[in-house]
From Swiss-Prot:
Gene: otaD
Molecular function GO labels: catalytic activity; FAD binding; flavin-dependent halogenase activity; monooxygenase activity
UniProtKB keywords: FAD, Flavoprotein, Monooxygenase, Oxidoreductase
Any Gene Ontology biological process: ochratoxin A biosynthetic process
InterPro entries the record matches: FAD-bd, FAD/NAD-bd_sf, Flavin-dep_Halogenase_NPB
UniProt name for this protein: Flavin-dependent halogenase otaD
Known pathway: Mycotoxin biosynthesis
Entry coiled-coil feature ranges: none
Catalytic class of the enzyme: oxidoreductase
Disulfide bonds: none
Length: 498
């Protein structure tokens, strides 16, 4: 099938965000084309999903495919932040509840989503990279004279080249973020979360929680020196993904002091700093069977996640340290809001200016909530046994994890799933943890700023929060609009219509 010369919507990128957006749009009968640079199936990291994935998949009729595929079922996750007992976030609070998620091999799960976009009616092409985007002045647009994207040039792996015109553009191009980095130039890095990641795949690892109700769930453990954390994620191909996320500056210092000479040796040396996970790697049975992979893990965000006739989705706009497995959630939730806002604009539910701003604000809110909880967890990890997330004298973090549960499980971003007050409480709690109020203005029992960890990083944390405050809003209602999630009528509606 030849790549068409014109489409109503062009989606750049066939990962979870792009494929989800394309599926939702195509199911509305909207002419949608997806151009993906890689050839599917392709490798990707980010293998643990959160509870919100289920309602998102159900909305595009993809949930049953995932249920029946054979991925490792994820009923929750355990987090060890210091020497206190680990916290556990339970996806299944009621017996028999259909709220579990999965650990996935991304080459397989992403391929399912990419193929589903085609089944839904989108025209999908892999091995085709978008090389440039053309913009033009839109005389009908009064939004600060922002130019409108109208066409894209592409090059296929087989050497073919061409261009495609479109009415709307969804940029789901991953960390490359072609529109954010090349045209809007609005990406900002968060130096406080400037990390590096290294990981590999093991066979024969002992499951976490053997003989307990949480047996086999993913486990995330802080390194003893507070320099980072380790993930332990069992997969259905009989391997366990084990990765180390470490502050880049501290990682560089450690390498200079280390006597190891290879990335594999440094990975194994660093892994020893996670004592709980190390105990799951019995040297007589557990074997590292892959090469060590590496990636920069720098968190970033954008000042806006779109412009007239443009929507930015997933890693193309923002990325957060993956401690709470937020990547796929932010991608698919952004993919849905891109589809909702484009459908609304096409159907005349609201002006295009209101539609793109609704999408952009929603992405900023979802990113902001996850950023706050990740900052809080990072602060606790670096603080060691000093209380940050919990109160002085408290054992464990159960109370804190119950408060932030709507955010770390993603359900705060599923319309109608969580009371607004619960989301507000999670955000307020996380804000107070990251940047405590002055003495006498916070609840007693929580550690004060003067006693908190990372005093040398307070300026950097403040910079991150100031950047967040410019975009974050406490409500997901923007421009007086909210999503209308009805197949055949996807779009936006006035809050007064609810």
């Amino acid at each position: 099938m030849a790549i068409p010369q014109k489409a109503t919507v062009l989606v750049i990128g066939g990962g979870p965000g792009g494929s989800y957006s394309a599926s939702a749009l195509a199911r509305e009968g909207i002419d949608t084309v997806v151009l993906e640079a890689d050839v599917f199936p392709r490798y990707h990291i980010g293998e643990s999903l959160v509870a919100s994935i289920r309602p998102f998949l159900k909305f595009i009729d993809l949930d049953d495919t995932f249920v029946n595929y054979g991925f490792v079922r994820k009923n929750g996750a355990a987090f060890k932040l210091n020497n206190q007992k680990e916290a556990y976030t339970d996806f299944i609070l009621e017996a028999g509840a259909d709220t579990f998620a999965w650990n996935v091999v991304r080459s397989e799960s992403d391929d399912l989503m990419f193929k589903h976009a085609a089944k839904s009616g989108a025209q999908t092409f892999d091995g085709v990279r978008v090389t440039s985007i053309e913009f033009t002045d839109d005389d009908d647009d009064d939004d600060n004279n922002t130019n409108r994207p109208v066409s894209a040039s592409w090059k296929a792996k087989d050497g073919r080249t061409g261009s495609i015109e479109f009415d709307y553009l969804v940029d789901a191009s991953g960390r490359a973020g072609i529109t954010s980095t090349k045209y809007l130039k609005n990406r900002t890095f968060n130096n406080y979360l400037k990390n590096v990641a290294s990981w590999g795949y093991w066979e024969g690892a002992t499951p976490y929680g053997m003989g307990t109700p949480v047996e086999g769930q993913p486990f995330f453990e802080a390194l003893q020196d507070g320099s980072g954390w380790v993930w332990f994620i069992p997969l259905h191909n009989n391997t366990t993904s084990i990765g180390i996320v470490m502050n880049q500056e501290l990682s560089t210092q450690k390498k200079k002091l280390s006597t190891t000479t290879s990335s594999r040796a440094f990975y194994l040396e660093s892994l020893a700093g996670a004592r709980g996970i190390s105990r799951l790697l019995d040297p007589t049975t557990a074997t590292l069977t892959s090469d060590i992979k590496h990636a920069s893990d720098w968190s970033y965000n954008a000042s806006a996640y779109g412009s007239p006739y443009l929507r930015i989705v997933g890693d193309a706009g923002a990325f957060i340290d993956p401690y709470f497995s937020s990547g796929v959630h932010l991608a698919v939730s952004g993919g849905l809001s891109a589809a909702v806002s484009i459908a609304a604009s096409i159907r005349g539910d609201c002006p295009e200016e209101a539609a793109w701003k609704w999408h952009s604000q929603g992405v900023a809110n979802r990113y902001g909530r996850f950023l706050l909880v990740v900052l809080g967890a990072t602060k606790q990890i670096r603080a060691g046994d000093r209380p940050v997330l919990n109160g002085v004298g408290d054992e464990g973090f159960d109370e804190a994890f119950m408060v932030i549960r709507p955010v770390i499980q993603g359900i705060a971003d599923v319309q109608g799933k969580v009371p607004v007050q619960d989301v507000y409480d999670a955000v307020t709690f996380s804000t107070n943890v990251v940047q405590p109020a002055a003495e006498g203005k916070r609840d007693p029992g929580w550690v004060e700023k003067a006693r908190g960890a990372l005093s040398h990083d307070e300026k950097e944390v403040g910079s991150v929060l100031n950047n967040l405050a410019k975009a974050y809003k406490t409500t997901d209602v923007c421009e007086g609009l909210m999503a209308r999630l009805e197949r055949g009528h996807l779009g936006l509606k006035l809050v007064s219509e609810v």
